[in-house]
């Protein structure tokens, strides 16, 4: 697991829970407003945290923490994400996944393995402007729709969220999201 950041306690990232937040490196989008740009563009320049050390901290904080938010970057790009989430679940912690939704097959697989308890998906813009706002020419909107439909139907708590940028969004965009 490429872990580039670790917040030991958050009251914001996982609604209703005292949680830790784990930041993974890399992303397949290039949103110009990304708050974690270094995770996306230069993850190798950031300190890489040892997975086992992070798990030890989580284990010590059981009883304080009830969950872990795994965010990025884009966590679904991590080839060993499922193995890592299993280790978190073995600690008795709930898992919230933050995703851009471009890899619906990964989200569905993690759900089917019982590794997710909450999903948050960013909706970047209206379908007409999605590729431009996500910085992803050639973006396949069907992948976004597939993730959104799956998340809505899977039975887990979820949220969809949009970062509003005056220079990139119009009022009409929100009507077609």
List each model region and its residues.
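Short, charged low-complexity linear segments at domain edges
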Residues: 1-18
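Short, flexible loop segments at the rims of nucleotide/cofactor-binding pockets, characterized by
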Residues: 44-47, 73-74, 96-97
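A secondary-structure boundary/capping signal
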Residues: 23, 71-73, 161
């Amino acid at each position: 697991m490429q872990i580039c950041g670790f917040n030991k306690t958050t009251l914001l990232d996982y609604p209703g829970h005292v949680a830790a937040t784990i930041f993974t490196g890399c992303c397949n989008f290039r949103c110009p407003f990304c708050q974690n740009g270094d995770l996306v563009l230069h993850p190798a320049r950031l300190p890489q945290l040892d997975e086992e050390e992070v798990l030890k901290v989580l284990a010590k904080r059981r009883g304080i923490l009830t969950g872990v938010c795994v965010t990025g970057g884009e966590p679904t790009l991590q080839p060993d994400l499922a193995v890592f989430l299993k280790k978190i679940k073995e600690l008795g912690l709930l898992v919230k996944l933050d995703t851009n939704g471009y890899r619906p097959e990964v989200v569905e697989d993690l759900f089917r393995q019982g590794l997710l308890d909450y999903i948050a998906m960013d909706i970047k813009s209206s379908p007409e402007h999605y590729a431009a706002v996500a910085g992803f020419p050639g973006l396949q909107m069907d992948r976004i729709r597939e993730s959104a439909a799956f998340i809505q139907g899977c039975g887990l708590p979820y949220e969809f969220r949009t970062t509003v940028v005056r220079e990139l969004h119009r009022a009409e965009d929100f009507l077609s999201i």
